[in-house]
Amino acid sequence: MVKDPAFLFYFNDFTVGTMYFTNEETGQYIRVICRLADKGHLPEEEILKICNCQKIPNCILGKLKQDEQGLFYQQRLENEQTKRASYVKSRRYNLKE
């Protein structure tokens, strides 16, 4: 099955949640979210490359969680991807009937 190329983006929630980020941090964060949506949980080294920095900014780090392997993920993104996958699956099922 082809990976879903989209996720719901709640712009008001994003705007409020990043209100005190600098423009640079906002850009870094959106790039991290996009990479997480595409690849799943990420190691710190990859996030550092995305952010082009030596330390993940605290404001971005505060939006991420770590799994048992120490990889980073964004819980809201995972929830939205799961809901979307369930919805798409239900639509496919309805088409078969």
Label every model-predicted segment:
Residues M1-E97:
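Detector for short helical micro-motifs
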